[in-house]
Regions:
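Acyl-CoA-dependent O-acyltransferases
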Residues: 167, 184-238, 242, 246
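Short, hydrophobic beta-strand segments
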Residues: 1, 45-47, 221-225
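Sparse, context-dependent recognition of short Cys/His-centered cofactor- or disulfide-binding micro-motifs
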Residues: 4, 32-36, 41, 146, ...
C-alpha cells in the first residue's frame, strides 16, 4: 500500500506526480532469505529508488514521506487499491502460469516457499479475493495492521542503507540521508510500537494436491520436493542448475 495511499502532505495522485518528476519511481518489496542449515527464513522489507544526483535530496524526502507519513484510513481508496491489486495479480498469474504453479507447489514444502507464494503468488491472490469480497468486515483489521507494522519495521536498529553513486556525488547522498535519519528519529519517538505484543509468525506448511481451472489454453503441472536431507547437494550446484533451467 505504500506509495498508493495519501500521505499527510500529498494526495496519492500528487505523490505519484512528485515521485515521477524527481525520480525513476519509489518502490517497495518483501525479500525472503533462507538461513543456511536451517528451515527458518528472514524477511526483509526493501524500499528502493533511482534518481539523478541533483535530485537525490527531493527523492529521499519523498521516500521518507512514503515510509513515515502514509495514511491508511481512507477506506474508499483503500478498497480501490485492494480491488486493483487483485485484478493486476490475476492477469500476472494467468500470463505466467508455470511460475504460479511452481510457487504454489513449493508453498507446501518449505517455509520460504510458503512466504513467497503468500506474498506474490496464488496464496496472496486468495487473500486478496477474501479481502475484496469481505472488505467491510476486514477493513479495520487491515488498517490497524498496516499502522502497527510500519511502526515495528521502520526502526534505526533494523535499517541498512546502501547507495550506488560516483564518489563526487556521495556528499549529496550523505546530506540527504542526514535529513532522512532525523525524520526516522522523529517517527520512532512519536510512534512507539508495543513490540512485546508481536509474535513471530510460523506458517503452517502442509503438502497439498490442488488443481485450478482457468480459461488458458496451456495446462501446467508442478511437482515439488526438498533435497535438504540428501547428502552432497549443498555445494551450490543445484543453485546453478536452477538458473540454467529457469
Amino acid at each position: 500500500l505504500l506509495g498508493y495511499m495519501d500521505t499527510t502532505e500529498h494526495t496519492f495522485r500528487e505523490f505519484d506526480t512528485e515521485t515521477n518528476f524527481y525520480s525513476g519511481g519509489i518502490g517497495s518489496d518483501l525479500n525472503i532469505y533462507s538461513l543456511y542449515n536451517s528451515e527458518d527464513v528472514e524477511l526483509k522489507f526493501d524500499v528502493k529508488t533511482k534518481t539523478l544526483a541533483g535530485r537525490i535530496k527531493d527523492t529521499v524526502r519523498l521516500m521518507a514521506e512514503m515510509m513515515f507519513k502514509t495514511v491508511f484510513t481512507d477506506e474508499k481508496h483503500l478498497r480501490e487499491v485492494v480491488a486493483e491489486t487483485r485484478s493486476r495479480l490475476k492477469v500476472r498469474l494467468m500470463s505466467a502460469g508455470h511460475q504460479a504453479a511452481v510457487s504454489y507447489s513449493m508453498a507446501g514444502i518449505t517455509v520460504d516457499g510458503w512466504y513467497n507464494d503468500y506474498s506474490m503468488g496464488i496464496g496472496y491472490y486468495d487473500y486478496l479475493v477474501k479481502l475484496d469480497e469481505n472488505f467491510d468486515g476486514e477493513k479495520e483489521k487491515l488498517i490497524k495492521g498496516c499502522e502497527e507494522l510500519v511502526k515495528a519495521m521502520f526502526k534505526k536498529e533494523n535499517m541498512l542503507i546502501s547507495c550506488t553513486r560516483d564518489d563526487e556525488d556521495y556528499a549529496k547522498f550523505e546530506e540527504a540521508m542526514s535529513s532522512f535519519i532525523g525524520k526516522l528519529d522523529d517517527f520512532e519517538k512519536k510512534n512507539k510500537a508495543d513490540v512485546s505484543t508481536l509474535e513471530k509468525y510460523r506458517p503452517d506448511v502442509k503438502y497439498r494436491k490442488t488443481a485450478f481451472s482457468t480459461p488458458a489454453e496451456i495446462q501446467y503441472a508442478a511437482v515439488s520436493g526438498s533435497y535438504k536431507d540428501v547428502p552432497d547437494v549443498n555445494d551450490g550446484a543445484m543453485t546453478v542448475t536452477r538458473h540454467l533451467l529457469s
